[in-house]
């Protein structure tokens, strides 16, 4: 089953959960906001430490239909990946579509990202 490859998951909508459980520094949230590459990277690193897994990923974004701004429009999604070597990689994408479409595209991109990184590292 999935327990062979998934150690766990955490939904960290609130900044409080991000800081308490994932050890995202409050300074990062204050300076960059919850939807940022800095936050996504810190979330992935914290998830790896928290879970003792080989890999961790994070997704933070604005799926809509509201909540966007000119700097961070609806569809803005930041990703973080952290692997066994401790290196954190981040990326931002802007997806189009409704809330469900943005969520589906985000999940697909995050999983493709971790799979590609895991295969590359093992090569």
Predicted regions: what is each one?
Residues 1-123:
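Short alpha-helical segments enriched in small residues
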